[in-house]
């Protein structure tokens, strides 16, 4: 195991000698360096006495800092073996932001999940009638139902990327797909580039592997290849997770020139790109044509992840991975230790729904456009201090609060009947407190009422305690 000297930790932590309380500033400095990769995971920290001498503080101060790091999950210790850096286990935290309460009567603005389209009921009824034709085997296919893999491959081909069914692995949603890919390709201490802000479950999946998260900032204007390149070079990352199509939460859309530059960057640094296309089909306005990231890939560096949840319905729990045929098979072997295969009925339904793709896209576009207008108009009328860029697709607004803090606001809003997803959920360790993600996937009248309640929460604080959770629902 690598060691860090007391002098190295003192330099990297960069604590102002006048900071008060000093132990907390020291713990924050060490944590920040772990999160940006300057202090690697699984390296031995100096003994408390040595670090205290280097910093010219009492040993009690360093002991308190180490205790705080252990409490937060950034330090592990064993009697006689010393202490070493770590990453927190998301499952051990008191508040798990990936699961938020549902069934409590609140307006659920923490979740960007559209309702089921009209075509879903028809598709389900049809596949129930058709199921006996597919029920002669044992029902287990780790790669996914051949019919559905053909439909997904055909859609990629129609979008400009020739794809064979053997390149497709059907999964239990995009989150399952992310876990499979990261579980196979990322290990403890490996650097993984992510956007900041980004999809929270991607951070969760990488952390569960013990990977070192390297955030790279993006804005409503999009991605800067020079920043991505610099972060990849400095961190040594060989895997980057990106969402170029109506990015969650900003709604940004990456243009083709940037896609080409990013894939060229991956080629230069011998890195893989894990591309999340969950929102790809949901352009709300007319947008310039963009090609899939895989269209710029000349040497199999792009692994694409898709989902039925946003276009059709989250309850279907069907997603997929597009990769090389060899990698798709490796992922299928990897998934077999967890769930063997996906349910046939839902896969048949999604295969049917692909036949209604354009119909559903048009239905979604109309609904999202109306809901987006209601949310935007409500915010401009009732909360004009908040600013945002209206996205041309996807399902979320990334709102800058301009002086308000998202976490206290979310706590107050729950007392007014609105559940929110504050900015820190989409960043690392308390960053992005000045932002809020607001989805426009609910009906217009619900969003109008939600904004009125948000104004009351901002002006008056909690109207009462947040409802006691009745059940759990996913934050997506």
Feature locations, PLM:
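N-terminal basic, amphipathic alpha-helical segments
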Residues: 1-129, 150, 332, 336-342, ...
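Short hydrophobic/aromatic beta-strand micro-patches
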Residues: 322, 398-400, 439-441
């Amino acid at each position: 195991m690598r060691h860090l000297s007391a002098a190295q930790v003192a330099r990297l932590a960069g604590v102002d000698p006048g900071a008060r309380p000093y132990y907390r500033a020291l713990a924050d400095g060490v944590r920040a360096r772990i999160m940006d990769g300057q202090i690697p995971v699984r390296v031995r920290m100096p003994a408390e006495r040595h670090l205290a001498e280097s910093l010219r503080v009492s040993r009690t101060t360093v002991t308190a800092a180490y205790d705080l790091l252990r409490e937060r999950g950034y330090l592990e210790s064993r009697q006689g073996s010393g202490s070493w850096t770590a990453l927190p286990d998301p499952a051990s935290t008191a508040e798990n932001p990936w699961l938020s309460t549902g069934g409590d009567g609140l307006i659920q603005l923490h979740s960007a999940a559209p309702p089921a389209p009209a075509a879903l009921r028809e598709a389900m009824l049809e596949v129930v009638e058709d199921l006996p034709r597919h029920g002669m085997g044992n029902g287990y296919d780790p790669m996914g139902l051949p019919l559905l893999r053909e439909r997904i491959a055909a859609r990629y081909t129609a979008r400009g990327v020739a794809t064979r069914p053997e390149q497709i692995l059907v999964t239990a949603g995009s989150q399952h797909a992310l876990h499979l890919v990261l579980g196979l390709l990322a290990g403890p201490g490996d650097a993984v580039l992510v956007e900041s802000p980004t999809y929270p479950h991607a951070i969760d999946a990488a952390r569960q592997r013990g990977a070192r998260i390297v955030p790279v900032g993006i804005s409503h204007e999009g991605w800067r290849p020079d920043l991505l390149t610099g972060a990849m070079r400095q961190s040594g990352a060989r895997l980057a997770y990106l969402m170029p199509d109506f990015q969650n939460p900003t709604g940004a859309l990456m243009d083709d020139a940037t896609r080409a530059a990013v894939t060229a960057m991956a080629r230069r640094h011998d890195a893989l790109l894990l591309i999340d296309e969950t929102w790809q089909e949901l352009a709300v306005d007319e947008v310039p044509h963009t090609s899939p990231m895989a269209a710029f890939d000349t040497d199999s560096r792009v692994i694409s992840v898709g989902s039925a949840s946003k276009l059709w319905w989250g309850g279907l729990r069907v997603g997929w991975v597009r990769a090389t045929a060899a990698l798709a098979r490796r992922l299928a072997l990897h998934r077999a230790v967890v769930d063997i295969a996906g349910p046939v009925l839902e896969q048949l339904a999604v295969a049917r729904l692909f036949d209604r793709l354009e119909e559903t896209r048009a239905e979604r576009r109309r609904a999202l456009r109306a809901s987006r207008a209601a949310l935007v108009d409500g915010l401009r009328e009732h909360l004009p201090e908040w600013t945002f860029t209206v996205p041309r697709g996807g399902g979320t607004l990334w709102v800058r609060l301009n002086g308000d803090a998202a976490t206290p606001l979310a706590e107050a809003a729950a007392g007014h009947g609105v559940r929110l997803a504050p900015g820190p959920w989409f960043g690392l360790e308390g960053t992005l407190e000045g932002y809020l993600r607001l989805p426009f996937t609910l009906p217009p009248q619900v969003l109008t009422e939600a904004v009125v309640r948000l104004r009351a929460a901002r002006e008056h604080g909690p109207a009462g305690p947040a409802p006691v959770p009745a059940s759990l629902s996913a934050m997506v």
